[in-house]
Amino acid sequence: ETDIPYCIPAGDMGAQEDWCPENSSEGFKGMITLKSALANSINTVSARLMHRVGPQPVINLIDKLGVDTENIPAVPSIALGTPDLSLFEMVSAYSAFANKGVHVEPQIVSTIVDKNGTVLYQSVPKAKDIISQESAYVTVNLMEGVTQYGSGARLRSGAINNYVYNNVVTGHPYMFKNPIAGKTGTTQNQSDGWFMGMVPNLVSGVWVGGDDRSVHFPSITYGQGATMALPIWAVFMKKCYEDEALNISQEDFERPEDLSIRVDCSQPVEGERQEVELPDELDF
């Protein structure tokens, strides 16, 4: 993809006026891989991709992933996370990617047992194949870039000398070594900060914000998901790993056999066709 100024004209895909998203950082990077663009929250690339796919197929897919789509408009700006979603919905949707394309409906209560040990209620998970194992793996691989060299790199040793993170109460650096896929998120005016994180057998998320969106950080330095929400996720995961009884995975995400999609696009392959035709529907 290409990180250059990009506009979707009024009337196209439900846009009421020309929509020209900007990046949080100044300037543009030119040619960039989709993985790197996602890792660094390059909005122009997300807009370009949405323009190619269209918002309605995206809405159809997330509906199958447990998201209430009734009030989500079919407009291109949803590519930047404009809909109001609950943390419950986000964890539900992300779990399908970690679970090899299978969505399992989350349960608040799994079992009810009386004082004698008799099981009064046992939930039966509702599982459904939503996307292919290959598509799920590629999505996870894309999001691994976020914690490897993107906005979530401080989970490892990234930003180790950044003054913003020095002496914070949550501890830094976090120095995770295991594979982690994730995504930071920041809403308009720094009113909300998100971090969603995945390891092979656990999906968890953190939202920081308030009911009154007029209460927010004055700048993105402290008001972004990487500084508001990610540290809480890091502390939570460290506690999870300290409890060996939880058996939280530190292994790689399982790669499907005969993977047909090349996940390392940093170097073009000689003779490979650069433009591909998009399917009529997303993979569901």
Regions found by a protein language model. Name each.
Residues E1-V58, H103, D114-G145:
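Conserved catalytic neighborhood of penicillin-recognizing serine enzymes
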Residues I4, P76-I78, Q107-S110:
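Extracytoplasmic/periplasmic beta-strand context in beta-sandwich domains
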Residues A10, G81-T82, P106:
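Structured DNA-binding interfaces in DNA transaction proteins
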Residues A10, N71, S214-P218:
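Extracytoplasmic/secreted cell-surface and envelope-processing proteins
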Residues G14-N23, G54-S92:
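Mid-domain, small-residue-enriched loop/turn segments at the edges of structured enzyme/sensor domains
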Residues S36-N40, S86-Q274, L282:
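A penicillin-recognizing enzyme superfamily signal
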Residues H51, D63, A98:
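Short polybasic/polar patches that bind polyanions
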